[in-house]
Amino acid sequence: MSKLKLNDVNIYYGDFHAVQNVNLEVPARSVTAFIGPSGCGKSTVLRSINRMHEVTPGAYVKGEILLDGENIYGSKIDPVAVRNTIGMVFQKANPFPTMSIEDNVVAGLKLSGEKNKKKLKEVAEKSLRGANLWEEVKDRLDKPGGGLSGGQQQRLCIARAIAVEPEILLMDEPCSALDPISTLAVEDLIHELKEEFTIVIVTHNMQQAARVSDQTAFYSLEATGRPGRLVEIGPTKKIFENPDQKETEDYISGRFG
């Protein structure tokens, strides 16, 4: 059974139809990459998976997004609970700059009412180890998170996301602002994280999609102002070497987009 399933998903911002008729499945403990030209809706779909797009006034979804068979848009489902179960790492690292490294990691736990200092310290260490950051920061946990390098800040944000023990981790271009060395560190981390988490990543870097993902979804749009759509999804090797759709092949080979 798929961990995540989108059935006839259409996404709107007020009267604007942003994405149309997306159907896809994401297996548990795998990495799925979303690729496609700017404006095709891949980040919009990503944000709809944990209801983050709803912070935009007038945004809504038609269709179903199923997590372990349950529609996350069901009438009795709490969006905050959805965001705890489905974590998000954004394009720009966004640690709380004046908060200590340790407090950054456990901010979500504290927000949900956890006060046991021993547990908070244990979770902070476990999460920093999980984000391959512990050895670099273990002697300065009380220092501000804003003092870390860009790559370290992004891994700190990943540690913060996994501290609340989500089942799915969404990543919206997590390496776009990073140098090649920091990018490699995050990519290595993604390979390790999929042992425990289901990951969906949006990337403009097709080489990155090829390196880190098990399956790839290609999105496109017919023209500016038209809805984005899912053109094709399949095993990453097949999408990059022998896609079913000419549109996919043209994008990957650099003929458009």
From Swiss-Prot:
Keywords: ATP-binding, Cell membrane, Membrane, Nucleotide-binding, Phosphate transport, Translocase, Transport. It is found in: Cell membrane. CDD domains: ABC_PstB_phosphate_transporter. Its main location: membrane. It catalyses: phosphate(out) + ATP + H2O = ADP + 2 phosphate(in) + H(+). The keyword Lipid metabolism does not apply. Pfam families: ABC_tran. It is a peripheral membrane protein. One of its GO terms (cellular component) is plasma membrane. SUPFAM superfamilies: P-loop containing nucleoside triphosphate hydrolases. GO terms for biological process: phosphate ion transmembrane transport. Its EC number is 7.3.2.1. ATP binds at residues 36-43. SMART domains: AAA. One of its GO terms (molecular function) is ATP hydrolysis activity. Residues 4-246 form the ABC transporter domain. The complex is composed of two ATP-binding proteins (PstB), two transmembrane proteins (PstC and PstA) and a solute-binding protein (PstS). Part of the ABC transporter complex PstSACB involved in phosphate import. Responsible for energy coupling to the transport system. This is Phosphate import ATP-binding protein PstB. The gene is pstB.
